[in-house]
Amino acid sequence: MAAWARRDSGEKKVGKNPTDRGKPGTKTSLLVDEQGGPLGAVIDGANVPDCKLLEATIAAIVVERPTPTRQSPQHLCLDKGYDNPTGQQAAASGGHTPHIRRIGEEKKACDRKRGHKPRRWVVERTLAWLSKCRALLVRYDKHARNYLGLIQLACATYWYRRLCRLCNQPVLG
């Protein structure tokens, strides 16, 4: 027995109907800093390739960042899914220097230097933390703007708790 939701129940940010062989569901594209703090989030259907969401994700950054210069360029670490002209062009248009590594390359390069751990898990860890929020684990919202708002609220909660932890203050609520 299979269960699926009609396509119109999630507006245009849900993948195709499962009977159309498209992957159903919602994909969250998240941009984080080096410690896993969320900087920008975008949602779309799960059947949309990651490289097509990169430009919108970069545009969704909510913090002001310094203008990239030759002396201090802005770096963007990406996985192999972005190693194509679309992904590289989106990174360059955002003023970032893309660093794209295959799955094994990062571990091999870091094995030589003690104290340098691979950074591929940072985004996955943040997505795992966001999935602890019950409203984000299973999408109950019909409208995409409501679901994106819940993601942004969870990201704001992350930053609030991080600030309280850095200032040695108790977390309220």
Where are the regions that the model predicts?
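Residue-level signal for inorganic ion chemistry
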Residues: 54, 79, 153
